[in-house]
């Protein structure tokens, strides 16, 4: 018997088994449809760097999701990633500064294009980190906050709320953040 557990020996095989069997997909636990569904939308991590200690909150969500599955409830933990506009711009501008350039040197269109490419390059590693941690989200349903279908739903919802008078303009103090 080995003196210490070496996760790299076992966990890739276990993870592959989970993925091959779609173990975390909605309906994978043969749920009792008479029980109330459990749906949890993952607060999307920002696609501008690695996960950090703050992302440990996902452990709590994972526990709740696994518990709902064990109860036989129809269960979905919806994963996603976010572009985090302002923060991503800050991170990307620091990267540019380290390379001796700035967004002003690039021009607006080139800067926008390069930030978009940067975000695209960061989404994969973040999702991979979450999978390595064993989070039981339905990875086939991964969403990005700027996916066309997500943007369409947000715009439709905004227009509906505006038309119903739930969104309005006025001179009011707002809690922004």
Model features per residue range: what roles?
Residues 1-177:
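N-terminal, positively charged nucleic-acid-binding surface of large information/translation enzymes
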